[in-house]
C-alpha cells in the first residue's frame, strides 16, 4: 500500500487553482471640472484612451465650487481591453518613476493620480487643453465574479473571493516591475 501512495505522490504535481488567479477587470480614467474645464477634460481623456467619454452630472448644490444640480461636473471612461490597460499602465507608471505608494492600494483595487498629462510618454502639450491632470483606478477580480451580477440564478460571493492588498502588490511587482513604497506623506 505504501508503494502505491509513494508512486502517486511522486507523479502528481501541485497545480494552482485557476479560480484563485487574479486579473484586471477594468480601468477607469476620471477627470473633474465644471464648464470650460469639463470640455478640456473630455478632450484629454479622448486623447489618452481614444474611446467614448461619459459625462458626470452633479446631483447636489455646492455653491463654493460653483456646482448646481444637473450641471456637468466631470467625465470618465471605463476601459476593459486588457492589452490596452497594460499598455496605458506602463506609460502611466513611467511618470511615477515606477513606484506606487502602499496607501493607494486597497482591497480589489488601486488608485493614483497623474498631475500633468504632458509627463506621459507619447503625449505632447495641446494648447486647447492646457495643463490638466486626471485620476486612474484599476479594479481586480477573480474568476466567478459573474455569479454576483448575472440576471438568472444570481448568487453571492464569499469574502475570500476578494483580491487582497498583498495579492495586488505581488501582481504589480511581477507583471509591471513596479516598486511598492511605504510613504508617510501623500
Locate predicted features:
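Ribosome-associated RNA-binding proteins
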Residues: 4-186
